[in-house]
Regions:
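Amphipathic, small/basic residue-rich leader segments at the start of a protein or domain
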Residues: 7-15, 26-35, 51-207, 214, ...
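Membrane-helix interface "capping/anchor" motifs
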Residues: 14-28, 42-46
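A short core secondary-structure module
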Residues: 269-326
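Flexible, small-/acidic-enriched active-site or ligand-binding loops
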Residues: 323-349
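A glycine-rich, basic-preceded beta-loop-alpha segment at the flavin cofactor/substrate interface
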Residues: 342-377, 394-411, 556-578, 592-609
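Loop-to-helix element that buttresses phosphate recognition and phosphoryl-transfer chemistry
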Residues: 415-442, 470, 623-634
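Charged, glycine-rich active-site and insertion segments that engage polyanionic ligands
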Residues: 445-477, 646-659
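C-terminal amphipathic alpha-helical interaction region
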Residues: 547-815
Length: 815
């Protein structure tokens, strides 16, 4: 009986903490329970004394704030100031950049699902939809990935179409002659282009991402906006932006490029300006750019502007015909044809008016870049990764039906089904995350942490989809030529892994490294107090935050235990019967994540910055919870249709499984082994619940991408994908073969039955169709239908070959 009283006490305290009941009322409830326990439980006095002492230990700091600050908070504050990792100015700007959105809810340990579901659905305007259905569709039809690769350039007609129809002006407001499209529309355009050609998508997306237009919109002077934005919108100027250098890469803090404040001659007059020296590389659109955005470090050694000498990272806009600018040569990134190359400048003099935002923004360049990068990185590269997944879903699902081995379609093999499921399931999951994040940008957010999550996970999953597609296609994907619709995508996949922050860096340093500070309810505020000079007031504020932080950590520990023991099953959750279980699973994971994140930061302090693999695993948990949230939001917005259950269930099991795997690995490698074992009991009291999609789920998703055009589940998965209809196009030829083989399936079955029964016995060298026609099993029209289907199948299966003369290396073309 006594054990039952103790069990109720422990569970009750955990539940009060889980519900985040205020400390003093919670202590009051516990005190009343202990009085009852003393009266009726026959508990020994020494045990009750221990419980009352524990209550006193907890209550004393709450009831005696002055003593708490003096003997608890003050030493902790001094320790916190010592262990706080040093932070460079560029790191501080990166952390301060952007806004916190749903990532903050996940970090809270208790996400408000009603808040997520209340966000408006993504939607295109009529004008945006017309642009996608019209000029974007037309642009896709104008290009061939193979021909682009042979010419090492887009066709002239495509360049003209891009300029004429404002593809470089998607984000430029209408008052400057641009399209003024939403972030979602921008993402839809980039994704559709990516389903046709990576080179085409890269060419269009860069001016609409981090570049002169974005920077001018946020920080440019009125004169700069009025001059440059209309020219960019019309395509009179082609922009590029130069940040990355040979030695420092994209580490702006180590940038060797300089601009020295000096006087020089400009348009016949002595003018105060900057003398620039720089060397950059990997700059997309650089070889054809007429307007160069440049990042450099500004210095004022002669104090022409003031006492400060090192002014900081600054940004300027420089016409590429300015004397001293060297630009035009090209890189060949894995043979991709989009314009990319180096540029440099030696003693290039520019007036201060060339600074983006004018002299007022001198030295504020890194802050400007970080704020703009969080928006662009939320849209462009996630759209390209999703485009790759949708395209590979389209062609691989059909190819696995068209191509046969051992007289059965490839799609019948379980090994192939596993690859098909990874492609199709990832495509729907990635699309959900892309849509949710673009929606956040349209709601006014600048989601810096979420943009890092999307950049990493959507480009990685895009590369995974291309890899699986190559495995299924086999030799068809390897032999280059006009009929290979996959090879150049495979060649170009590592490019998107590398740009805008290499993925290995994003995962190991940025996602949790930035998110732990930026999204945590208290850490950023506590760090700000640590640097304050008014020590007494800072201590007082730190004390208040510390009490909240401790309550937060205790609550998350209790929630982790309570929810994993099954209490969460009785709590209200939104959604239908299927999705409710997933909302509850994410509640469990969010509580566990918040607990482990807090403990990791407490145990390691500044060392966590160097324990990259622990940081990466915490980032993986946060990332997969976000992907799962996106899938739940999309499923809810579509009114939870039955036909989407295979894709939705796969996406949730994939995300939850990966999140649990990261938690498992984190606990196995936790810095304190004893604490790690204790935490494992709390986080996984019954072991892991989600290990990824089952074989049966994989088979269902594999079947989806092999279905005929018009199937509602397939159409939802492929929405926004360019689908050429001409049988002369290699992708169109695949669709044509799929349709003919589907229509001729009853005849194929009829022929196979006749062959098996011996009704049709082809002579040596005689085709089975001809033998069936002679035997009267097939009518002439039926025989022709089968011949047409087989010819279409053969056209798809065939690969290219070349004569020696055709392979003679032609002189490369440089625009």
């Amino acid at each position: 009986m006594l054990l039952l009283w103790i069990l109720v006490l422990v569970v009750g305290i955990a539940y009060l903490a889980h519900r985040r009941v205020a400390p003093l009322p919670a202590l009051g409830v516990v005190a009343v329970y202990l009085l009852a326990m003393g009266a009726w439980s026959h508990a020994p006095g020494w045990l009750l004394l221990i419980f009352w002492v524990l209550i006193a230990v907890v209550a004393a700091p709450l009831l005696l704030p002055d003593l708490r600050r003096q003997y608890f908070t003050k030493p902790l504050f001094i320790w916190f100031q010592k262990v706080l990792p040093p932070m460079s100015e560029t790191e501080r700007d990166a952390i301060d950049a952007g806004t916190v959105w749903w990532d903050g809810e996940l970090f809270s340990g208790r996400p408000d699902w009603d808040k997520l579901l209340a966000y408006p659905k993504v939607q295109l305007t009529e004008e945006e939809q017309a642009f996608i259905d019209g000029p974007t569709e037309e642009l896709c039809a104008m290009v061939s990935d193979w021909e682009i690769g042979q010419a090492m350039d887009l066709p002239p007609a495509a360049w003209e179409h891009i300029k004429t129809h404002g593809f470089f002006a998607l984000i430029i407001p209408k008052e400057y002659g641009g399209k003024g499209f939403s972030a979602y529309a921008h993402s839809q355009v980039a994704m559709k282009l990516a389903t046709r050609s990576g080179d085409l998508a890269s060419t269009v997306m860069v001016p609409n991402s981090l570049g002169p237009a974005e920077l001018l919109l946020h920080y440019g002077t009125d004169e700069q906006r009025n001059h440059y934005l209309p020219r960019l919108a019309r395509g009179d100027d082609i922009p590029c932006f130069a940040l990355t250098g040979p030695l420092a890469g994209s580490d702006a803090g180590a940038m060797p490029d300089t601009g020295v404040i000096c006087k020089g001659e400009w348009e016949g007059k002595q003018t105060l300006g900057l003398r620039l020296n720089w060397e950059k590389r990997y700059i997309t659109l650089g070889p054809v750019a007429t307007l160069l955005g440049l990042a450099f470090k500004a210095h004022d050694p002669d104090h022409l502007l003031g006492e400060e000498e090192d002014l900081g990272i600054s940004l300027a806009l420089i016409p590429t015909d300015t004397p001293g600018v060297e630009i035009g040569r090209r890189h060949l990134p894995l043979g991709a044809a989009f314009m990319n190359g180096p540029n440099s400048g030696k003693d290039v003099f520019i007036p201060l008016e060339y600074l983006i935002g004018g002299q007022e923004m001198l030295g504020k360049g890194w802050m400007m870049l970080m704020n703009c990068l969080s928006v662009g990185r939320s849209i462009s590269l996630p759209a390209v990764g999703t485009g790759a997944a949708k395209f590979t879903s389209l062609v691989t699902g059909q190819y696995a039906q068209v191509r046969e081995q051992f007289n059965v379609p490839l799609s019948a093999f379980e090994g192939i089904q596993e690859a098909l499921a990874r492609i199709g399931g990832n495509a729907w999951l990635m699309d959900s995350a892309r849509m949710l994040t673009a929606n956040a940008v349209d709601l006014g957010e600048k989601p810096s942490v979420l943009s890092a999550i999307l950049k990493y996970h959507l480009t990685e999953r895009g590369r995974e989809c291309i890899g699986h597609a190559m495995d299924v296609h086999g030799g068809k994907g390897i032999i280059m030529g006009p009929n290979n619709y996959l090879g150049r995508s495979w060649q170009g996949a590592p490019i998107f892994i590398t740009v805008e922050g290499a993925n290995i860096l994003s995962r190991n340093l940025m996602i949790f490294g930035q998110g732990a500070i930026r999204c945590h309810p208290f850490v950023l505020k506590e760090m700000a107090l640590a640097g304050r000079e008014d020590h007494d007031q800072a201590l007082k504020e730190f004390d208040g935050l510390l009490m909240q932080h401790i309550g937060f950590a205790v609550s998350n520990a209790a929630s982790t235990l309570v929810l994993n023991l099954g209490v969460g099953h009785f709590e209200k959750a939104p959604g239908n019967r299927l999705s409710q279980g997933y909302f509850r699973a994410l509640n469990r994971q969010a509580a566990a994540f918040a607990l482990l994140a807090d403990l990791s930061m407490m145990l390691l302090g500044g060392e966590l910055k160097r324990r990259e693999r622990l940081s990466a695993r915490l980032g993986d948990v946060l990332s997969h919870m976000y992907l799962a949230s996106a899938a739940l939001k999309r499923y809810h917005d579509l009114d939870s249709p039955d036909h989407l259950q295979p894709l939705f269930t796969w996406a949730m099991e994939e995300s939850l499984g990966e999140s649990e795997r990261a938690l498992d690995e984190l606990l196995s490698n936790f810095p304190n082994k004893v604490l790690g074992c204790l935490l494992r009991v709390i986080v996984f009291p019954f072991g892991r619940r989600h290990t990824g999609p089952s074989d049966a789920m994989d088979a269902e998703v594999a079947a989806v991408i092999g279905r005929a055009k018009g199937d509602p589940t397939l159409e939802e998965l492929l929405a926004g994908c360019y689908r050429p209809q001409s049988a002369e196009d290699p992708v169109g030829a695949l669709q044509h073969a799929y349709d003919l083989l589907g229509a001729s399936h009853p005849l194929q079955k009829k022929l196979h039955t006749a062959l098996k029964s011996g009704q049709v016995k082809p002579a040596a060298g005689e085709h089975a169709i001809d033998a069936a026609l002679h035997a009267g099993v097939l009518q002439p029209a039926e025989a022709q239908t089968l011949r047409d289907a087989e010819a279409a199948r053969r056209k798809v299966i065939d690969v290219d070959d070349f004569s020696k003369e055709e392979l003679t290396q032609a002189e490369g073309k440089v625009r």
